[in-house]
Design a protein with these regions (language model features):
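N-terminal intrinsically disordered, cationic/polar leader segments
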Residues: 2-9, 68-76, 98, 125, ...
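Extended, compositionally biased
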Residues: 59-108
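Hydrophobic, proline/glycine-rich low-complexity stretches
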Residues: 2-74
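Internal, well-folded beta-alpha domain core
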Residues: 88-187
Length: 187
């Protein structure tokens, strides 16, 4: 763990930011896939304004497919909420002492969600054709990005519940993140 990492507050990031939320969303049927990657290679891909967040010296890249449910702006009635499939490719960064997520790519099965996220949040969203099959015990998830042919296909079975993540554990490092960071062109 780096000297800078010691000063990162890994407990209070779970507290809600001040002010009203921009909207509502629920994530369901998540799968977290992660790989350790060389820090030097990852550093070249992440903007310099972000510090790589390392778990005991190791950098991680993750692929996270899931179902996004009940997505709507704060003032919109629940009846307007959208549900769609999404996959994100991410790594973990720190900005001003706050641990968060940096997305390399996000795919969504909703063209509207892609357009709004790109415009309002400068996130690298892409439209994709996606399919989710199976039940709560076994799931197949497929995604093909529109216009590029990029394909993601995974089949997984649910194992035993892990329980709450423990501070300092890899699970806590990867999952207990409540901030996302991006850069807008020109800032």
């Amino acid at each position: 763990m780096s000297a800078a990492a010691v000063s990162i507050d890994r407990i209070t990031p779970g507290l809600r930011p001040e002010g009203p939320a921009w909207g509502y969303q629920n994530w369901r049927r998540l799968l977290f896939l992660h790989w350790a990657v060389p820090v030097v290679a990852l550093r070249r891909l992440v903007p310099r304004s972000f510090e790589l967040d390392l778990h005991y010296g190791t950098a991680y890249v993750g692929v996270v497919p899931f179902v996004m449910e009940g997505v709507r702006p704060r003032l919109a009635p629940p009846a307007t909420a959208m549900n769609f499939l999404e996959t994100n490719v991410r790594t973990y960064v720190v900005k001003d002492g706050v641990p968060g997520v940096y997305f390399f790519s996000l795919e969504a099965a909703s063209r509207l969600a892609v357009q709004v996220a790109r415009l309002m949040f400068a996130l690298p969203y892409h439209h994709a054709s996606m399919r989710l099959e199976g039940g709560p015990e076994s799931t197949r998830y497929r995604s093909r990005r529109s216009g590029s042919g990029a394909l993601f296909n995974v089949h997984y079975s649910v194992g035993q519940a892990l329980g709450p993540s423990l501070l300092g554990s890899l699970e806590h490092f990867l999952i207990e993140r409540y901030w996302l960071f991006t850069e807008r062109e020109g800032t």
